[in-house]
């Protein structure tokens, strides 16, 4: 029952094997006061940026189908971005390194189809780790401009450790679950040295109510990333792990990052 609950909650992998494209800085982003709604100037800046922007690939997480990420993809399309959704191979159950190799091929397909030199990655949960492995070890640093992770266990999550502790078949035989355990060999390799390599612009978004990434601060990166805690800006905002891809405030951060605008989450967005 516990495993079913956890797996259902993580139902968050994404996307298509086909390319569905529709035309249309190094400080932590933690404030001391709550931000107000985005100004009309910021909205205009975002719209202008989208017109000539990189293609955006939404990279999903463990267990899920493409449709789970259609809401955030639809928001991006409405803002003028060319968007595709990438579903992890085998629903993300397998080796994250293998998923990263598959993502590498997918990125090349998108670049060829669009003529773009680089893409932007908007990732959720396990998808953030898949994307980081691709950037760090598989040549993605020269092909990715912006990286945004939503609730990705960058330093692991003790939820995976608990499953192991309970003896549920070593994460019930799920390789990716084992790799997301705090202290795993996979995470040791991924986080060794600079955890934000290359010229990629790195941003993470996390929420206090994340029931799957615990401790919550394990969803942040250390070296040169903008790390956004939703409740640092919007203390009354309640957003869970799955809610990060549906939440308006979270999306306001995504669109600001993609537009190269200053990060000021809109606490009133729906």
Predicted features and spans:
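Secreted/periplasmic proteins that engage bacterial cell-wall peptidoglycan
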Residues: 62, 77, 91, 99-102
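Active-site glycine-rich loops that stabilize anionic/oxyanionic intermediates
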Residues: 61-64, 208
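Conserved alpha/beta-hydrolase
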Residues: 73-93
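Secretory targeting and sorting signals
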Residues: 1-31
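Surface-exposed patches in mature extracellular/periplasmic domains of secreted proteins
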Residues: 89, 93, 115-121, 160, ...
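Helical cap/lid subdomain of alpha/beta-hydrolase-fold lipid enzymes
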Residues: 136-270
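N-terminal low-complexity, Pro/Thr-rich disordered segments
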Residues: 20-51
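Serine-dependent carboxylesterase/thioesterase catalytic core
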Residues: 54-60, 67, 82-86, 97-193
């Amino acid at each position: 029952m516990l495993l079913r609950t956890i797996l259902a909650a993580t139902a968050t992998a994404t996307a298509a094997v086909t390319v569905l494209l529709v035309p249309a800085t190094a400080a932590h982003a933690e404030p001391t006061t709550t931000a107000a709604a985005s100004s009309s100037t910021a909205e205009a800046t975002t719209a202008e940026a989208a017109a000539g922007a990189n293609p955006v690939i939404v990279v999903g997480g463990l267990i899920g189908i493409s449709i789970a990420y259609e809401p955030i993809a639809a928001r991006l399309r409405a803002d003028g971005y060319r968007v595709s959704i990438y579903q992890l191979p085998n629903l993300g159950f397998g080796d994250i390194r293998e998923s990263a190799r598959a993502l590498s091929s997918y990125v090349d397909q998108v670049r060829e189809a669009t003529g773009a030199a680089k893409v932007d990655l908007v990732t959720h949960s396990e998808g953030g780790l898949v994307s980081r492995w691709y950037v760090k070890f598989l040549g993605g640093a020269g092909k990715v401009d912006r990286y945004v992770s939503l609730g990705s266990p960058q330093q692991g999550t003790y939820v995976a450790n608990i499953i192991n502790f309970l003896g549920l078949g070593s994460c019930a035989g799920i390789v990716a679950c084992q790799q997301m355990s705090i202290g795993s060999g996979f995470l040791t390799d991924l986080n060794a040295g600079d955890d934000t390599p290359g010229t990629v612009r790195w941003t993470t978004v996390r929420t206090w109510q994340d029931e799957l990434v615990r401790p919550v601060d394990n969803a942040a990166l250390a070296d040169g990333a903008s790390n956004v805690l939703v409740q640092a800006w919007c203390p009354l905002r309640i957003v869970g792990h799955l809610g990060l891809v549906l939440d308006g405030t979270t999306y306001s951060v995504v669109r600001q990052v993609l537009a190269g605008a200053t990060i000021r989450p809109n606490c009133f967005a729906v």
